C-alpha cells in the first residue's frame, strides 16, 4: 500500500489514497501503523475516498492512533487538500469534501498554505454531544484534580476549552485525560488550554481525544477561538500559537462559517505491506 507522510504544524499524518487503491483498514491495523517504533507513526491516519455525493470531489475519513474513527481534523484537512493535489487526483483550487458529519471546502492559497471553511460552530449541547440542559457560554466541570470553568463547542468533533494564566504551566497531561473522559462528554472530547495574549492573539495547547497532546490541533484552534469570541474575550480574526506553529482563525459570529488558514507540509512517500 502506498502512502504519504505529512504534517500540519507538527501534527503528523499518514495519508492514504483510497481512490486508486483498494484499502481495508481495521482498528488493529491502524494501531500497528501508528506505532512510532514498529510502524509508520502518526497522530492521525487520513483516508481519501471517492465522493459519496456526485457534486463533491472526495470523502474525507480520519482515524486516531488508537484506531478510533472521528469526524473532523482541521490540520488533516489542510494536508488532505495538499495531498490530492500533489497526487494529481484533482487540479481544482477549491476542493469540496464530505466528512462523517458534514461538508467542507478546502482552498489552496499557495505552495504551503491552505484555507479551510470549517462550517459553523455547533453550540447546542445535544449536538456536541455534551450533557447540559441548555447552552451556556461557561460550564462548570468537576474532576478529581480540580473544578474548571470552560466553554464547550463542536467543530464536527467535541471541544472543551478552558482559559489558563500561563500556557507553559497548564496541567495538560494531568487534567486533559480527566476532562477528555468526563461523564458529561458521552463521545469523549478534545481539551484546549488557552492563554489569551490579547484580543487578536492566543496561545493554545490541546489534549486530543484518542491521541493525547499533539504539536497542533486545527479544529482545537477553531474551537478555542469560537469559545473566546462567544465569551467576549476575542475579536473576529485571531492568531493561534500552538507548540508546532501558528494558525489564523476568522469567525464573524453566529450564523457564519469559521475559516482556518495554515501550512500543510509533505514529508515523504512510502510503501508498506499490510
From Swiss-Prot:
<keyword id="KW-0413">Isomerase</keyword>
<protein>
    <recommendedName>
        <fullName>Diaminopimelate epimerase</fullName>
        <ecNumber>5.1.1.7</ecNumber>
    </recommendedName>
</protein>
<dbReference type="InterPro" id="IPR001653">
    <property type="entry name" value="DAP_epimerase_DapF"/>
</dbReference>
<feature type="site" description="Could be important to modulate the pK values of the two catalytic cysteine residues">
    <location>
        <position position="208"/>
    </location>
</feature>
<dbReference type="GO" id="GO:0009089">
    <property type="term" value="P:lysine biosynthetic process via diaminopimelate"/>
</dbReference>
<comment type="function">
    <text>Catalyzes the stereoinversion of LL-2,6-diaminopimelate (L,L-DAP) to meso-diaminopimelate (meso-DAP), a precursor of L-lysine and an essential component of the bacterial peptidoglycan.</text>
</comment>
<feature type="active site" description="Proton acceptor">
    <location>
        <position position="217"/>
    </location>
</feature>
<feature type="binding site">
    <location>
        <begin position="208"/>
        <end position="209"/>
    </location>
    <ligand>
        <name>substrate</name>
    </ligand>
</feature>
<feature type="binding site">
    <location>
        <position position="44"/>
    </location>
    <ligand>
        <name>substrate</name>
    </ligand>
</feature>
<comment type="pathway">
    <text>Amino-acid biosynthesis; L-lysine biosynthesis via DAP pathway; DL-2,6-diaminopimelate from LL-2,6-diaminopimelate: step 1/1.</text>
</comment>
<feature type="site" description="Important for dimerization">
    <location>
        <position position="268"/>
    </location>
</feature>
<dbReference type="GO" id="GO:0008837">
    <property type="term" value="F:diaminopimelate epimerase activity"/>
</dbReference>
<dbReference type="Pfam" id="PF01678">
    <property type="entry name" value="DAP_epimerase"/>
</dbReference>
<dbReference type="InterPro" id="IPR018510">
    <property type="entry name" value="DAP_epimerase_AS"/>
</dbReference>
<comment type="subunit">
    <text>Homodimer.</text>
</comment>
<feature type="binding site">
    <location>
        <position position="157"/>
    </location>
    <ligand>
        <name>substrate</name>
    </ligand>
</feature>
<feature type="binding site">
    <location>
        <begin position="74"/>
        <end position="75"/>
    </location>
    <ligand>
        <name>substrate</name>
    </ligand>
</feature>
<feature type="binding site">
    <location>
        <position position="64"/>
    </location>
    <ligand>
        <name>substrate</name>
    </ligand>
</feature>
<feature type="binding site">
    <location>
        <position position="190"/>
    </location>
    <ligand>
        <name>substrate</name>
    </ligand>
</feature>
<keyword id="KW-0963">Cytoplasm</keyword>
<dbReference type="GO" id="GO:0005829">
    <property type="term" value="C:cytosol"/>
</dbReference>
<keyword id="KW-0457">Lysine biosynthesis</keyword>
<comment type="similarity">
    <text>Belongs to the diaminopimelate epimerase family.</text>
</comment>
<keyword id="KW-0028">Amino-acid biosynthesis</keyword>
<feature type="active site" description="Proton donor">
    <location>
        <position position="73"/>
    </location>
</feature>
<feature type="site" description="Could be important to modulate the pK values of the two catalytic cysteine residues">
    <location>
        <position position="159"/>
    </location>
</feature>
<feature type="binding site">
    <location>
        <position position="11"/>
    </location>
    <ligand>
        <name>substrate</name>
    </ligand>
</feature>
<feature type="binding site">
    <location>
        <begin position="218"/>
        <end position="219"/>
    </location>
    <ligand>
        <name>substrate</name>
    </ligand>
</feature>
